[in-house]
């Protein structure tokens, strides 16, 4: 068979705002990874050993190029994707490509969680310092390149993390009367939030507190959900509650950050939070140009 070799850039970044007037970079992880078919390990060596030694060989060759050596560009990791045992992989024309891409995406979500762990280990998150994570906090344990034990331990780092999603399914939850929540969300007044709802992860491994906030007054919004964000926090144990005052403080701070400075630059501007927009911009500025990446191979 013909198997694709895939390369991906992974950038995970975090910025901090020590005061209203100061916004600065905090952490950045940048990796270039290769996703290769598992049968590329032709000697059936232990996967980790094979990937490490082959990665070293590639970097040895790359360093012969003066520009690459000077810029410190290197392949950080080799991932091996599945090539059999699954009809979706073997029968779909793009099956191998999808399998390889999934490996790279899993590496990215792993790095997101490892960055949260690093913030916790540096005592940067507490009752006075919360992390706003762009997107959902729901991670699927089936899509990880970490061991199950290591992945499970990462979930304990999310006490002071709030996931904020610009795009969401308004019909994900039902209200306390069993009706779809989409109508309640659509009818939110400016700066109003919904009640907080308990949501169990699809894989049943964790529970979340979820609520929705309308960020601004907008007479010309495209849809009823254009300036609404979905907020979520991990519940530390089944049945746990989060104090209403804390939810209100978090919601108020999120509303304060909703400056539409990226209007016209991003179709999601109505749902944007300014610090997230700046952090996204910071991360994008650290990507290698496509020409440089392609010329590595």
Which residues fall in each region the model found?
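Long, contiguous domain-sized segments
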Residues: 20-297
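Two-metal-ion RNase H-like nuclease active-site motif
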Residues: 1-3, 15
């Amino acid at each position: 068979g013909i198997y694709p070799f895939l390369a991906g850039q992974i950038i995970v970044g975090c910025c901090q705002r020590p005061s209203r007037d100061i916004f600065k970079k905090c952490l950045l992880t940048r990796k270039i990874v290769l996703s290769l078919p598992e049968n590329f390990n032709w000697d059936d060596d232990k996967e980790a050993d094979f990937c490490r030694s082959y990665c070293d060989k590639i970097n040895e060759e790359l360093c012969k190029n003066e520009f690459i050596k000077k810029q410190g560009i290197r392949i950080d990791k080799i991932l091996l994707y599945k090539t059999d045992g699954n009809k979706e992989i073997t029968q779909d024309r793009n099956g191998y490509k999808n399998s390889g891409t999934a490996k790279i995406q899993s590496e990215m979500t792993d790095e997101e969680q490892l960055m949260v762990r690093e913030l916790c280990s540096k005592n940067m998150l507490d009752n006075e310092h919360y992390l706003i994570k762009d997107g959902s906090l729901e991670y699927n344990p089936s899509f990880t390149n970490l061991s199950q034990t290591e992945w499970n331990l990462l979930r304990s780092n999310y006490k002071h993390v709030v996931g904020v999603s610009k795009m969401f399914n308004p019909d994900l939850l039902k209200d306390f009367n069993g009706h779809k929540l989409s109508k309640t969300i659509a009818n939110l007044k400016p700066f109003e939030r919904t009640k907080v709802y308990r949501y169990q992860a699809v894989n049943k491994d964790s529970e979340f507190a979820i609520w929705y906030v309308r960020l601004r007054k907008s007479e010309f919004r495209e849809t009823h959900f254009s300036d609404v964000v979905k907020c979520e926090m991990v519940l530390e144990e089944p049945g746990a509650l989060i104090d209403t005052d804390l939810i209100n403080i978090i919601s108020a701070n999120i509303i304060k950050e909703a400056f539409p400075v990226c209007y016209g630059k991003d179709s999601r501007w109505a749902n944007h939070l300014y610090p997230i927009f700046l952090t996204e911009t910071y991360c994008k500025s650290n990507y290698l140009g496509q020409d440089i990446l392609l010329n590595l191979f």
